[in-house]
Amino acid sequence: MKLTTTFLVLCVALLSDSGVAFFMDSLAKPAVEPVAALAPAAEAVAGAVPSLPLSHLAILRFILASMGIPLDPLIEGSRKCVTELGPEAVGAVKSLLGVLTMFG
């Protein structure tokens, strides 16, 4: 029963508008940015993670917490690693942080 409920919650999360937007954005390849524009983009990504007022009710945070995965260290670690990434990975991390923030 727990497995069925978890699967149902995961399907609802993936099929919601946010999940669709995430997968649609991941299919589109961003244009390669010049190296000079990479540093401001990395700083913008690191500072672009807002705190939502209902973050404790988010589905993804609940799923990760039930599996024993803390979300806050994951986001902080991603912020620290953004400055070391290449231009291709900056867009992917930006999408990931946006989805993680949206869900929790």
Swiss-Prot record:
Keyword Disulfide bond: yes
GO molecular function, one term: cytokine activity
Signal peptide: 1-21
Segments passing through the bilayer: none
InterPro entries (UniProt xref): Secretoglobin_3A
GO cellular component annotations of the record: extracellular space
Major location category of this protein: secreted
Compartment(s): Secreted
Keywords on record: Cytokine, Disulfide bond, Secreted, Signal
Tissue: Highly expressed in lung, where it localizes to epithelial cells lining the trachea and bronchi. Expression in lung is mainly restricted to bronchi, submucosal glands of the trachea, and tracheal epithelium, with little expression in terminal bronchioles. Expressed in uterus where it localizes to epithelial cells of the uterine glands. Also detected in heart, stomach and small intestine.
Record bears the keyword Phosphoprotein: no
GO terms for biological process, alphabetical: positive regulation of myoblast fusion
Family: Belongs to the secretoglobin family. UGRP subfamily.
Function: Secreted cytokine-like protein. Inhibits cell growth in vitro.
Complex formation: Homodimer; disulfide-linked.
Protein name: Secretoglobin family 3A member 1
Organism from which the protein derives: Mus musculus
